């Protein structure tokens, strides 16, 4: 009984906290779907999108040490090159 009351109070507190902390300064819920997909997309790719996701054959791959860059296709990073 005591645990149940504590759980109910905790859920009510967290729900109230969520509503208080929600940023709805621009009436975000009403404007959530107002823009079309084309208007929401950035016409120019960002720097992250321009970056290669994988290294090609004979490319430098320091990712073997850091774990960031991987080789494309079935290639493996041997030393510092994708082979």
Swiss-Prot record:
Expressed by the venom duct. Residues 1-22 form the signal peptide. Residues 23-50 form a propeptide. It is found in: Secreted. Disulfide bonds join 54-72, 61-77, 71-82. The keyword Secreted applies. Its main location: secreted. GO terms for molecular function: ion channel inhibitor activity; sodium channel regulator activity; toxin activity. InterPro entries: Conotoxin. GO terms for cellular component: extracellular region. Pfam families: Conotoxin (PF02950). Keywords: Cleavage on pair of basic residues, Disulfide bond, Ion channel impairing toxin, Knottin, Neurotoxin, Secreted, Signal, Toxin, Voltage-gated sodium channel impairing toxin. The presence of a 'disulfide through disulfide knot' structurally defines this protein as a knottin. Belongs to the conotoxin O1 superfamily. This is Mu-conotoxin-like PnMKLT1-014. It comes from Conus pennaceus (Feathered cone).
């Amino acid at each position: 009984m005591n645990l149940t009351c504590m759980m109910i109070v905790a859920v009510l507190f967290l729900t109230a906290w969520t509503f208080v902390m929600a940023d709805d300064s621009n009436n975000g819920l009403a404007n959530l779907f107002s823009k079309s997909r084309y208007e929401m997309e950035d016409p120019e790719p960002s720097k992250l999108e321009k970056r290669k996701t994988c290294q090609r054959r004979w490319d430098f791959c320091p990712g073997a040490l850091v774990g960031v860059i991987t080789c494309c296709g079935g290639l493996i990073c041997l030393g510092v090159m994708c082979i």
